[in-house]
Each structure stands twice: as C-alpha cells, then as structure tokens.
Amino acid sequence: MINLNKHTAFKKTAKFFLGLSLLLSVIVPSFALQPATAEAADSYKIVGYYPSWAAYGRNYNVADIDPTKVTHINYAFADICWNGIHGNPDPSGPNPVTWTCQNEKSQTINVPNGTIVLGDPWIDTGKTFAGDTWDQPIAGNINQLNKLKQTNPNLKTIISVGGWTWSNRFSDVAATAATREVFANSAVDFLRKYNFDGVDLDWEYPVSGGLDGNSKRPEDKQNYTLLLSKIREKLDAAGAVDGKKYLLTIASGASATYAANTELAKIAAIVDWINIMTYDFNGAWQKISAHNAPLNYDPAASAAGVPDANTFNVAAGAQGHLDAGVPAAKLVLGVPFYGRGWDGCAQAGNGQYQTCTGGSSVGTWEAGSFDFYDLEANYINKNGYTRYWNDTAKVPYLYNASNKRFISYDDAESVGYKTAYIKSKGLGGAMFWELSGDRNKTLQNKLKADLPTGGTVPPVDTTAPSVPGNARSTGVTANSVTLAWNASTDNVGVTGYNVYNGANLATSVTGTTATISGLTAGTSYTFTIKAKDAAGNLSAASNAVTVSTTAQPGGDTQAPTAPTNLASTAQTTSSITLSWTASTDNVGVTGYDVYNGTALATTVTGTTATISGLAADTSYTFTVKAKDAAGNVSAASNAVSVKTAAETTNPGVSAWQVNTAYTAGQLVTYNGKTYKCLQPHTSLAGWEPSNVPALWQLQ
C-alpha cells in the first residue's frame, strides 16, 4: 500500500514544515522485548529528540547518533487513535491529514479511543536498514534505537506522544476516567512491545493555544494532572513486574500562560522530570526581528516593540516553573539546535530588533528555519553574513547587509551561558530539539563537556528551609516599603527569599532585606516572606507584616477629573478598543484604570486601551478612572456598553443534520463552524463533523 510521511511539524511551532513523501509500507511481525538494564547514574540529563522523519529526505539515521553525547533519546512522535484514525485534519496545521490506526505490520487495527499508536508504521517499524532482514520482528527506526541501546546499556529511549501537530486529542483523552485508563494501559503496552524505557507527553497545549481545531477545555488544567497520575500508577505497576523503572516526562511550554493553565507543582510530584521548551520565543509569525532563545531579558527588545520580551526569555520561563513549585532538579532546560530568520530587516542595529518584511524566504528544510550544521557550513561569517553578539541576552545573531536577512541562533558560546545557568539554578540538565540539526556534534560536545553525565546522582532535596523569622518594616515612604527579617536555615542552603504582597509575588532577593516600590500613597499593604533553596523548595510563610504607606509629600489629596467621552473605537470577536478624553490634575495624571463592570481590566498611561480575551457576540460595560502619583483616583467616566463581534459563518450554508445525504464538496455548519464534505455519505448519529475528520474538513 502507499503511505504518506505523516510528520511535517517540528516540536513547538507550526512554522517548521516538511513536505509529504510517498513511502512503501512493509509488513513485519511482533517484537521480542529486550532485557531490562539498570538506570544510568547521571549527574545531569542530556535529552535529545530524534524525529522519525529525519530518516527520510534529511538522511539522518539513528546510526548517525553518537550515544555518548546523550543520556536519553526521545523518539518523536507517536499519536493517539480516536474513532479508528489518527492525525490532525485541522487546516491551519502544517499537515492536515489523517490515517487509519495501524500496528507494526501496517495493518489497520481496532483499538479503543485514547490508545497510543505508531505515528508512521513504515519508518517506525517497517523500513529495513543495513544489517536488517526482511522477516525480522521489528525493523525501522525503533529497531535501530534498540540496537543503539544494546551497545550502550546506560542509554535510555523514551517515546514522545503528540507534538505540535498531533496534540488534537489530548484534551479528550484526559477528560474522562475511562479514556485516561485506556491511554495509560496503552502506554505500558507500547513500552513493553517496542522496548522503550519511558513515555513523554508533548501536549501543546492544555486549556488554550496550539492549533485552532485541537480539543481543549478549561478542565484541562486538572485533567492533565489526573492523566499523568494514572500513567504513573500503571507504569509503576508494570515496572514492579518487569523489574525496571519506567520513566514519565512531559514537554512543557515556557510561558506564564502555560504555568497558569497547568498544575505544575502537582505534575512535578508525579513525573520524573519536565523538559521545558525554552525556545521559539520569536519567529516569522511576527515582523520584528528578535531572538529564538534569549537567555536573559533585553530591555532594548521591549523598547523596539518585541512582544512580551520581558517574559519571553529562557530565564523568565524557567523561573516561572520554579516559582510554580517545580523542584529545580526536575526541570530540564530546552536548547534549540536551529535558528530563525527574517527578510527585509533594516541595517540599523545590524538587523536586530527591526521591523522586517517577514520571515526568511530560505532555510535548511523549511523557509525561515536554519539547522545549526547548515549555519556552520554556509552562514556564520560566510557568504556575506557577519556574526554579532548580544551580551545582554547572551545569544549570537547573523546579519547580511546585502540581502537584509537577520538570523537568530544558538552556538557553543550561547550554549555555554545556558549550561552555566543550569548549574547555577541546580537544574536537572538540558534537552535539545533535535539531533539532526547538529551533525558535526558541535553543540552536543559543548553540552557534554559542561554537564557531566557519569557521576553519582545527588539525592533529591525535598526539605524546605525554615520559616523566615521576625519579619518587620524598617522604612516607609509614600510609594515604597522596606522590609527585613531573620535568615532561614536549610539542610543544603538557602538561595533566596520570595516577598509577597498579599498573594502576589512582589520581588525575590538573596539577602534578608527588600524594598517594594511602586506602591500607592496612604494605602495599607500586607507582606509575607518565604525562603527557598536550590531544589525549589519553599518554606512556609513568615509572620505577616501590615504597613501603610505615608501620604504623598506636599499633601496632595486632590483627585484628577473624571475621564470624559469614553467610547469604543474597534471590536473583534475577542477584543474591544476604547478611547477617552484625557483627565486633568493639580499635579499630574499618571495613568488610567479601565474597568470591565466592577473588575479591573487593564491599566494604561495613555487615553486608549484594548481589552482582549473576551467572548464573541457578548456585551460588556466599561468605565475608566484616572489616577495621580499620590494615589488619588477620579470618579468613573461615563459607562459605555459594547458588544464583541459575532463569529462569522457562511451565509446560506445549512446546519448539519442526522440521516441526510451529503455530497463531496458540500458545506455545512456545526457548532458555529463551517465544514466541507470529503466523501459522499448519509449522516448518522455520532458522525458529527467535529467527530469524523475522514468525512468532514473544517473550513
């Protein structure tokens, strides 16, 4: 039979694209489990992803991997079977195709919804490589991985499920106890059948984000924890029978949104570690040239208008996980083995932080993306490209003044700063995407040199520091409070203190004093302090300190005038833009608070604001209040009621119905979305367009 290469997406973003290839399927019998080996004694983990499609046109095979450079290989990707098919038909994705679920013999199988299945049976288990025979139980990439382990007994292999393109069914799987049970049982079956040492869930993303057509629901936050808990239960039970430790890991997003949409502290207690994807912070989806994986925040990026620059960097992403309760030893830092490019970037700043015409029209395999080995061979200080260094963000970049192309990437120098960060924070190691991008082993050699993997595993520190004592206020102004406290102790060592204003983190310091600024004059605040150690353990809170800021010097008690002429200037399905006439004040207006009903929606310094994250076709009522430096707040402006735009549907298109004959190409609407019929059929209950992508394609 003819099969199609199923993977066109790289690990986090749809911007990676691989063309489809026609492949011949090979039928092979089942596989005999290899003997279990002892867990490697590693002081740091070095986890490398190997994508199945590397063995196609990229011609980078498992045999090309140097197993001494990694401790774990994550094989990407397996998928989830649902209604007899897998894949993702979402037209916004890089590969909107589905296939029947198949076994290692490329035979169609009938399995329950939520079962883990091979992503590409031909390349996974069917293709013969040198030394293979036509009738051996398992061939393909998976057999090659097992051969690699036979000669390197400390190497571990992990099957990664999902990825950017194939995360469409995770929410459905996690939603019920029945499907969680199916998924967890199939994980055990998959590991035993193909001799993997663990399973890695790459769900992109719970609650929100990812491809538009992915299943998602608010309950994903709690359901993800339940799913992982069930997998852990099944893996531990299987491990007790098989005499080995089965690993469970996840790939996590690096944004504050991901941390808010998951129960990271609970997840960390379940999994062996978390691979945080600290890359893809900037790319061709925006027109401002910026860095793929900046280690530190660069204020110049914010000044140039780079979106979310203060949080879209490696340090902020990792710290967000630590602050959410992930122990440092369970956090493995992501490193990209590729760069991202833009075209039409002005020469100012050597192309950095410039408004460009768009993403690069060229790349190694996809436009806009450059493998590191390709950059080494053809770009770095070659062919008109000059290497520059951003010493704040700690990353290199290339600029070609002739063609105005800017490329952000990582090299051995920037990787060195990232490994130093790993050590300074006591993190568990490094993960990288992906092995075929570093064919000269330049970056792998750097990781291996900086992160020794042959020592004794230090015991996991789970002891929290003692509670900071005698928290007190030592200074107060109109806009700041200075606090002090007695030092905590720890079995290993205290690394710092988090200071909280109410429930919100106000600042983090390494000493026993802190000044919290930006407060409102004449206002009462309550502060507590928690100590932390290198493993990410937090102490209980100190005694609460309640203190009031002083009145503004000069006795300014006069509030600004109320804003006037509040009006809506634009509406979309999810946002409303407002404008108003400026207020006046005896000293000066410092900003405006915009309220959605009684809730504060945003604070701005100008006289316009856009409120996002709203529901379509819904009415909202807004008011605005002005404020000054003394903390005086005006009366509310006039109220304005505005309705967001409705979701657009195709006029004249009929709603989908049961027991109706449909022809190929016919359009219907279902749950507010438009679908095109792919095959003639008569509809039945359960064949709703959202459930049967083999029959319907979302428009």
Curated annotation (Swiss-Prot):
GO terms of biological process kind: chitin catabolic process; polysaccharide catabolic process
Composition skew (Low complexity), residue ranges: 452-465
Active site positions: 204
Entry keyword annotation includes Metal-binding: no
CDD domains (UniProt xref): ChiA1_BD, FN3, GH18_chitinase
Single GO molecular function: endochitinase activity
Keywords, in A-Z order: Carbohydrate metabolism, Chitin degradation, Glycosidase, Hydrolase, Polysaccharide degradation, Repeat, Signal
Signal peptide as annotated in the record: 1-41
SMART domains given in the database record: ChtBD3, FN3, Glyco_18
Chain segments annotated as coiled-coil in the UniProt record: none
Family designation: Belongs to the glycosyl hydrolase 18 family. Chitinase class II subfamily.
The protein's name: Chitinase A1
Name of the gene: chiA1
